[in-house]
């Protein structure tokens, strides 16, 4: 599915895609006949090159010897990394017979375990203080045929959530917005957020055996409100001491964990204003993925200031609480419907029993 999606994006951008007609070797790797090839001698080569290669930013400074000039917006859009597809640059000297331009293959999105009669009962929290990430999550779920029910503040605050759901997902949203929601000047039922009553109901849901999943900044809300034995090492750190305005980081993954089933030991994470975790009580917490211990290996594409702040830190955790569990993501595994490489981490989390 990921390969078809990547090729489809290139094709919609009018990039010519060809296939190798014979097996070939490149960079010590053997590629079969039929492998897809994008030749950069074509009108839309720059578009293809921009999407296929990692982004490396120049070292721009405010003044000679001064602090770096941070980028304005997100800094990475390397589709092979985001989608988990191998893309290998070839030298100009490579010569091999190629097909005429081809159409990308078709593929139907779907993931095992979400079929009728086997899918968990999923509640997707929908704040009245609208979250863009919640919209992207709905789009991903609808596209990949993941069944879910929208979950609003009043339903959460009413409690007895385990009677209705097996898993509840909180998309990326600032803790203040989750807790307080919209101001009281709005008409009912829109004012207020989850509040302390909703936080208590979520904790009870987990203690009763449910799975609560929090993405990116929502993890900070869950850590604080459910009093989890986890600390965010980036809490209170100013932008001039750590900054990553939307970058692709490398992940080292514990593939023995059920959340990481079917994923590679080395994956990626879309990092944007997320937490990085330190475990306070290891008897209740299991690290599923962490950033590389070497600061120079944290960044895969984009820009980061002081990567040593997150080097070796946990990026994905399971916290046991009562009869259930909390899954904390320090990144966005379904980032804008692009990061197919980390979809399985989210989908597997929803299916934990």
Residue ranges and their predicted role:
Residues 1-296, 300-353:
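Intrinsic-disorder/low-complexity accessory segments
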């Amino acid at each position: 599915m990921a390969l078809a999606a990547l090729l489809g994006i290139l094709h919609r951008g009018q990039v010519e895609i060809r296939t190798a007609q014979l097996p070939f070797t490149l960079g010590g790797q053997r590629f079969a006949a039929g492998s897809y090839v994008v030749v950069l001698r074509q009108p839309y080569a720059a578009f293809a090159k921009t999407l296929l290669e990692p982004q490396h930013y120049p070292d721009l400074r405010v003044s000679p010897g001064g602090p770096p000039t941070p980028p304005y917006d997100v800094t990475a859009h390397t589709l092979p990394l985001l989608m988990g597809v191998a893309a290998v640059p070839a030298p100009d000297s490579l010569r091999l017979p190629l097909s005429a331009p081809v159409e990308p293959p078709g593929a139907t999105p779907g993931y095992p375990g979400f079929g009728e009669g086997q899918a968990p009962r999923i509640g997707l929290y929908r704040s009245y203080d609208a979250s863009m990430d919640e919209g992207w999550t709905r789009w991903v779920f609808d596209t990949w045929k993941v069944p879910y029910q929208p979950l609003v503040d009043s339903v959460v605050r009413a409690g007895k959530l385990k009677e209705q759901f097996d898993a509840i997902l909180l998309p990326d949203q600032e803790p203040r917005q989750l807790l307080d929601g919209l101001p009281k000047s709005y008409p009912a039922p829109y004012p207020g957020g989850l509040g302390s009553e909703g936080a208590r109901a979520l904790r009870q849901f987990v203690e009763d055996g449910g799975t609560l999943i929090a993405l990116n900044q929502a993890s900070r809300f869950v850590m604080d409100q459910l009093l989890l034995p986890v600390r965010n090492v980036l809490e209170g750190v100013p932008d001039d001491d750590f900054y990553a305005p939307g970058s692709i980081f490398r992940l080292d993954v514990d593939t023995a964990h059920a959340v990481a089933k079917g994923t590679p030991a080395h994956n990626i994470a879309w990092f944007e204003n997320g937490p990085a975790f330190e475990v306070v009580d290891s008897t209740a917490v299991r690290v599923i993925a962490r950033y590389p211990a070497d600061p120079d290996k944290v960044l895969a594409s984009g820009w980061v200031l002081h990567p040593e702040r997150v080097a070796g830190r946990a990026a994905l955790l399971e916290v046991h609480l009562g009869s259930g569990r909390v899954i904390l993501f320090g990144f966005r595994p379904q980032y804008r419907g692009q990061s197919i490489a980390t979809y399985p981490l989210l989908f597997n989390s929803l299916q934990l029993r």
